[in-house]
Amino acid sequence: MTPLKIAIAGANGRMGRVLVEAVNNHPDTVLSGALEHSGSEALGLDAGYAVGLKTGIAISDDVDAVLAQSDVLIDFTRPEPTLKHLQKCVEKQVNIIIGTTGFDDTGKAAIHTAAEKTGIVFAANFSVGVNLTFHILDTVARVLNEGYDIEIIEGHHRHKVDAPSGTALRMGEVIAGALGRDLKQCAVYGREGHTGPRDPSTIGFATVRAGDIVGDHTALFATDGERVEITHKASSRMTFAAGAVRAAVWVNGKTGLYDMQDVLGLNNR
C-alpha cells in the first residue's frame, strides 16, 4: 500500500507539532509538507524539530509547492488562513481535514461549496471520545426533554482565542437538534447582573480559560432532586491529532463534506 501523503498547516503551532508526530506514528501515512506563515522563525527548520523527529521535510510558506506533493492537508489554524488553504486545495484537488474553529456563517458556507469539488472532513473535535459523547448527548437530550435545565461548561488553555469552543457549540447544536430547537435562538452566553429567572427553553454556556487545560467539556442536565453530568476531559493533544490522521486516511478517494461522526460510522447507527 502506498502511504498517504499528508501535509500539515501551522506545523510549528501547539497542535501542528503533535500532528507531525501523529502522521509519523501512523503506519499508512507519510509527512509530505509542513506549512507556516511568511515570516515565521520556523521556516526552513525540519518539521519534526520540536518533537525530536527528523522528518526530512522543511517547514515552508509555499502553499502551492506543498500541496503539489500531497494527497491531503490537515489544518488546525485560524479561519482566515484555513479558508485560503481551502481554495488552494480545491484548485489542486487535494483533500482537507479542518479542525479550525471560530468560522462565521460565510466561512462555513465556503466550506460547503468547496466540498462539491474535494473531500473535506470538518469537525469541531477529532477525539473519538468527544464524538462518542456527541452521540450519547443526542440520546440523553431526547429522554430528558422536559423539566431539565441544560448548561454547557468548557475549559481550555489561556492561549485559546475563540469562546465558547467549537466543541461546546457542537454539543449545544446536538442537544438543541434533539429537542427540536434552534441553538441560535435558545443559547445564552454567560450571565451577569440581574438576569431574572432562568428561561427553561435556553441552553447556557460558561467558559473557562486558564493554564494549560487541553480541553474540558461538561453538559449538565439539572432538575429538582437530581442532575446528570456528561463530561469529557482531554489530557493530550495527541487525542485530536490521531483522530485527524484517521480522518485523513478515511476520506482518501472521497468527495463531499463529512464530519468525525461519519469517519467513526456513528451517523449510520
Curated annotation (Swiss-Prot):
Binding site for NAD(+): G10, A11, N12, G13, R14, M15, E36, G99, T100, T101, A123, A124, N125, F126
GO biological process, alphabetically ordered: diaminopimelate biosynthetic process; lysine biosynthetic process via diaminopimelate
InterPro entries, alphabetized: DapB_C, DapB_N, DapB_N_CS, DHDPR_bac, NAD(P)-bd_dom_sf
Keyword Hydrolase: no
EC number: 1.17.1.8
Active site positions: H156, K160
Main localization, broad class: cytoplasm
Xref: Pfam families: DapB_C, DapB_N
Subcellular location: Cytoplasm
Pathway membership: Amino-acid biosynthesis; L-lysine biosynthesis via DAP pathway; (S)-tetrahydrodipicolinate from L-aspartate: step 4/4
Sites where the protein binds (S)-2,3,4,5-tetrahydrodipicolinate: H157, G166, T167
Catalytic activity: (S)-2,3,4,5-tetrahydrodipicolinate + NAD(+) + H2O = (2S,4S)-4-hydroxy-2,3,4,5-tetrahydrodipicolinate + NADH + H(+); (S)-2,3,4,5-tetrahydrodipicolinate + NADP(+) + H2O = (2S,4S)-4-hydroxy-2,3,4,5-tetrahydrodipicolinate + NADPH + H(+)
Enzyme class: oxidoreductase
Cellular compartments per GO CC: cytosol
S-S pairs: none
Sorted UniProt keywords: Amino-acid biosynthesis, Cytoplasm, Diaminopimelate biosynthesis, Lysine biosynthesis, NAD, NADP, Oxidoreductase
Keyword Oxidoreductase carried by entry: yes
Function as written in the Swiss-Prot or TrEMBL entry: Catalyzes the conversion of 4-hydroxy-tetrahydrodipicolinate (HTPA) to tetrahydrodipicolinate.
PANTHER family: 4-HYDROXY-TETRAHYDRODIPICOLINATE REDUCTASE 1, CHLOROPLASTIC-RELATED (PTHR20836:SF0), DIHYDRODIPICOLINATE REDUCTASE (PTHR20836)
Family (UniProt): Belongs to the DapB family.
UniProt protein name: 4-hydroxy-tetrahydrodipicolinate reductase
Organism the protein comes from: Neisseria meningitidis serogroup B (strain ATCC BAA-335 / MC58)
